[in-house]
Amino acid sequence: MKRYYFTLALIVLLLGLTIWFNVPGHPQIKIGNFERSMDLIQGLDLQGGVQVLLEADLPAETPIDPQALEDARTILENRTNALGVSENLFQVAGERRIVAEFPGLSDPEKVLAVIKETGLLEFVDLQDNPENLQEGNLILTDFGQTSTSTQPTETTTAPATEGQESLASTTVYHTIMTGKDLKSVVVSRNPNTGEVVIDFTLSDEGAKIFDEYTSNNIGKILAIVLDKKIISAPRVQGRIPSGQGQITGNFTLETANNLAIQMRYGALPIPFKVVESRVIGPTLGRDSLQKSLLAGYIGFTIVILFMGIYYRLPGVMADLSLIVYALITLTLFRFIPVTLTLPGIAGFLLSTGSALDANILIFERLKEELRAGRTFSQALDLAWKRALPSIRDSNIATLITVVILFIFGSQFGATIVKGFAFTLGVGIFVSLFCAMVVTRTFMYILVDRMKPQAKHLKWFGILD
């Protein structure tokens, strides 16, 4: 029995921690570089926000590498995180689309300015700029067609095609290097003029290329081009061996920050277009949340009363275990963290049924063993042993369904299905722990302390 008292002490400690993390004004977790706010994150349908649907801006017959789509998702997520937009969610939807959700955000333009651009940064050799190209002009470059080098090449003229009316020139200019050679990017102000500028430092390889180019092309124009648009076209004044440079232009602090983010996190491997952008109001979500919580409270209360009335003392132990289950699950939702949506709340409430289902199987088996004349200790041992296969098989079947739903939600961007499956899955694992450890510990200690006899059978739900 000593191990059950030791387990009880651990359960009490765990219960104290979960209460600590779930009371108002709960603390943050900070261990070294690891930090977690422990806030309960609400999804779009609960607090409103912005939802954006992006689609690959390529011909329908062009195949898209799934890894490129996943890389694009990661880059977009990093960009918006750098903007300070927290709790965002990016999911690949099918073979050509990405769904982005920003709970709590009311202005879509803040993120659209960053996520809709490809972010391909190029350092382009304009030589003497014979065509008098200016900032804002669209040009053609040979990046992706030939390997980059520091040697100036003869420019060629690309045949005019449909969609190139806005090009300032049909000449194809040579790309010296790209944004992948950047090591760091910082937005600052010129101390003399107050102008917003972007300071950058190149990698070792990029610094060598930059040094060689500036040494051989003093007096020439080196354009800094983003998505084929010239954003700055400085003249090389001298050799730059340090690998450090500065981008100037008509920047505001916001546009400079957006550009720096695109430079910092790299170019998208696939160009995207915004198919749909919509703002979702929080009013309906708040109303739905209040009704869902009310339904949950009512259901929770009815279940607790039923278990206590029908199963008596074992039911009370199950009720205590159910409270532990709820606190552990909510703490996990805060820690992981899980973005709670209405379907996610439904999954959580449904998993409470699994928690009670295991207890009911055990208690019914316990009643059978007691009716057969077993002692309370023997009945407890046999009840858990014989109920375990049924509990295991039913939960495995549910978990298989959860996995299928989660994969389906991930594959097709069905965040509603994915959220439901995830919260249900977490709840099932916690419910198994509570049934097989928490309730069992409570029951063994109850029997040890109470030392019940045959006259106490009614307190274990046996009325006949």
Swiss-Prot record:
Q: What is its main location?
A: membrane
Name under which the protein is recorded: Protein translocase subunit SecD
Compartments it resides in: Cell membrane
The record's subunit annotation is:
Forms a complex with SecF. Part of the essential Sec protein translocation apparatus which comprises SecA, SecYEG and auxiliary proteins SecDF. Other proteins may also be involved.
The family assignment reads: Belongs to the SecD/SecF family. SecD subfamily.
Membrane topology of this protein:
Multi-pass membrane protein
Q: Please indicate if the UniProt record lists Transmembrane helix as a keyword.
A: yes
Question: What Pfam families does the record tag this protein with?
Answer: SecD_1st, SecD_SecF_C, SecDF_P1_head
**Source organism (scientific name):** Anaerolinea thermophila (strain DSM 14523 / JCM 11388 / NBRC 100420 / UNI-1)
| Molecular function via GO | protein-transporting ATPase activity
Q: What role does this protein play?
A: Part of the Sec protein translocase complex. Interacts with the SecYEG preprotein conducting channel. SecDF uses the proton motive force (PMF) to complete protein translocation after the ATP-dependent function of SecA.
NCBIfam families tied to this protein: 2A0604s01, secD
